[in-house]
Amino acid sequence: MLYNNKSFIFFILTSLLLSSHLLHFISAYASQHEDHETPFSYSEGTGKGPKSWGNINPNWRACGNGKMQSPIDLVGKSLLVSATLGKLKRDYNPASAVLQKGHFISVKWKGDAGQININGTYYKLVQCHWHTPSEHTFNGSRYELELHMVHISSDNKKAVIGIVYEYGHPDPFLSRLFPYIKSLGGKEKEIRNVNPGDVKFGSRKYYRYIGSLSTPPCTEGVIWTIVNKVRTVSREQVRALKEKVEDGFVENARPTQQLEGRATWFYSP
């Protein structure tokens, strides 16, 4: 009986510890995005468009004067081809989440949705969201949609995985979320289980560079990984994402930023 009691106490303490770590990751991400309460726009004609973001809020100065900003144009002739960057190691779990709308439609995980491992550092998955059209361009060309999967390490460093889409067959991950997106009335909707493992990469090849968050406060030092495979999404799915964006900016892609001498890699194992 004593063994069972100790086991129970150990289970409770372990659960509390894991919960506190998860809350740390979520609150760290939220603290970087709390300034979204300050209005900004994707339309330059409003005076609050992307070119003016750095002047709207003192905490957003990097949006205007940063030297490692995102997104960028990935130009084939400028890429450094590498076979040693390493496989992107994913370990995702289904977890409870909240579907939210604002400047974009997003899924914010409340439970432990798993992590990725980049160069020996673990980054917890906290959120994903969509931009229309794609934010990153490829030799100057944009795609119809881009998904960003946002991860945070224990020391508050960020890593984002980007996946671009062209029109074609429906995307399986969006198909599972589609009923919730279509019925999203208020600012958010609880979803019992969302499995980030349903997001398909389709290729081990990827682009890599150091950039920033692509929305205010445009925090720099973000590790960007853009999957090489172009996935497909249906027109109906993209239309649903655009219709539910709260502020009416159906095109919510920041213009590409200057490279400022940064290296861009292409991992080809």
Question: How should these model regions be labeled?
Answer:
Residues L2-P269:
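Alpha-carbonic anhydrase
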